[in-house]
Swiss-Prot record:
GO terms for molecular function: 4 iron, 4 sulfur cluster binding; metal ion binding; N6-isopentenyladenosine methylthiotransferase activity. It is found in: Cytoplasm. [4Fe-4S] cluster 2 binds at C157, C161, C164. Its cofactor is [4Fe-4S] cluster. Binds 2 [4Fe-4S] clusters. One cluster is coordinated with 3 cysteines and an exchangeable S-adenosyl-L-methionine. It catalyses: N(6)-dimethylallyladenosine(37) in tRNA + (sulfur carrier)-SH + AH2 + 2 S-adenosyl-L-methionine = 2-methylsulfanyl-N(6)-dimethylallyladenosine(37) in tRNA + (sulfur carrier)-H + 5'-deoxyadenosine + L-methionine + A + S-adenosyl-L-homocysteine + 2 H(+). This is tRNA-2-methylthio-N(6)-dimethylallyladenosine synthase. Monomer. It comes from the Bacteria. InterPro entries: Elp3/MiaA/NifB-like_rSAM (IPR006638), Methylthiotransferase (IPR005839), Methylthiotransferase_CS (IPR020612), Methylthiotransferase_N (IPR013848), Methylthiotransferase_N_sf (IPR038135), MiaB_methiolase (IPR006463), rSAM (IPR007197), rSAM_horseshoe (IPR023404). Belongs to the methylthiotransferase family. MiaB subfamily. One of its GO terms (cellular component) is cytosol. NCBIfam families: miaB-methiolase, MiaB/RimO family radical SAM methylthiotransferase. It comes from Stutzerimonas stutzeri (strain A1501).
Amino acid sequence: MTRKLFIETHGCQMNEYDSSRMVDLLGEHQAMEITENPAEADVILLNTCSIREKAQEKVFSQLGRWRELKQDNPQLVIGVGGCVASQEGAAIRDRAPYVDVVFGPQTLHRLPEMIDAARTTRTPQVDISFPEIEKFDRLPEPRVDGPSAYVSVMEGCSKYCTFCVVPYTRGEEVSRPLADVLAEIVHLAENGVKEVTLLGQNVNGYRHDGHDFADLLHAVAAIDGIGRIRYTTSHPLEFSDAIIQAHADIPQLVKYLHLPVQAGSDRILAAMKRNHTALEYKSRIRRLKAAVPDILISSDFIVGFPGETDKDFEQTMKLIEDVGFDFSYSFVYSARPGTPAADLADDTPEEVKKQRLAILQQRINQQGFENSRRMVGTTQRILVSDYSKKDPGMLQGRTEHNRIVNFRCDNPRLIGQFVDVHIDDALPHSLRGSLLS
C-alpha cells in the first residue's frame, strides 16, 4: 500500500521550494504520495519559519494538534524542519517528545534515511548541520507543476543584519554551480515551464567560480522556452550596475523588483547593520528606473525598531513617497532570540508601532492601487496559470508587473500560454481584463 505524506509549510518562498523538494525526494526514495489530510498520513512534516514573532509558539501549537494522531497511530512519523528546527534542535522534543525527526534547511536531503532510522530504531533523529550545498547534489529532478517554477540558486546570508535570524538558521551564503542551476532550468523548460523565479536569501549576491548574478541572469535568458524571469530576495548592497544593465538588456526579466530597504532613517539603517543609507538606496532605484522606466518596486519594512523616533518614521515615509513603492511586506518589530537587536531596549510602545504600521501600509496600498489604475486601458501580456479561484468561468494569469489578471474564458488550453489581455478595471488586489489573442 502506498504511504502518504502530509506537509505543512510556514514562511517564505524558500520554504515553499524546500517543501516541494521534500515531496520529490520522498516520492522517489520511498514512493510516498502527498495527501491534504494529516489524519491519513504515514509521515507528517512541518516546515517552519522563525522570521516573525511567536514563531516557536505557532510550531508547538500545530504539533499539539497532531499529538492525538500519534497516540492513535504510533507508527506515524512526525518531523520538524526549517528555521525553527535549526534554532531549537533537539530541544523541540523537550516540549514535543512525540516528534521523531528534526532537520534543518540544509539537511532535508537526508530525510529518507532519517525517517527510516526513526522507524527502525524507535529513537529520535536530529540533524541541523550546514553541509554546504550538498543537498542539491542529493535531490532528484524537480517535478513540474504548472507553467511557473522556483529554482534555488544560493542558500544562506552573510550580511548579519542585527534583527535577522537567517545567518544562524540557514548558514552563510553558498551558491550553487552555474552549470547545475542551468541544468535544472533546462529540465523545467523541456517539461513546459515558461517562467522561473530564482530564489535565495540574498539572491543577487550569487557568486560561483567567477560568475556573478548578472552572468546567471544572462545565462538563464538564453535557455529556450523560458519567457519570463523573476528573482527574490535581493539586498541593496549587491544590486550592482551589471544587474541594472541586465534589466535593460534582458526582455525576459519582469518589470518588477523586490528590493527590501527595511527603513528610511539612516540612523535606524545603521542600527540594523544594513550598511547603506537611504540616499544610496534611492540612487540605485534612480539608476534602475533610468534603465527600465516602467519598473515597479516592492520592499520589506520593519516598523518600531528599537530607538525609532517619530522623526525616524517620518524619514521612512518620505522614502516611501520618493520611491513610490508598489507593495510591501511590512511588520511591527519583534525581537528574534539570539540576534544582536534582541539586546537593544525595545522602547517603542506597541500601540505606537501599530499606528505607524497602519499609516505606512495604507500609503503603500494607495500607491499600489494608483499603479493598477494606470494600467486600465492598456494591453498587458500575461502567463495564464489556472482558473480563477472565485469564478470557474474565468482564467487568471500574472503580468510582468506582478498583477493578477482575471479574464472571461473557459478554454483550458490557454493555461501555460502567454496571451494579451486588455485591462478593463482595477480592483484592490487584482485586475479585470478581456482576452485579445
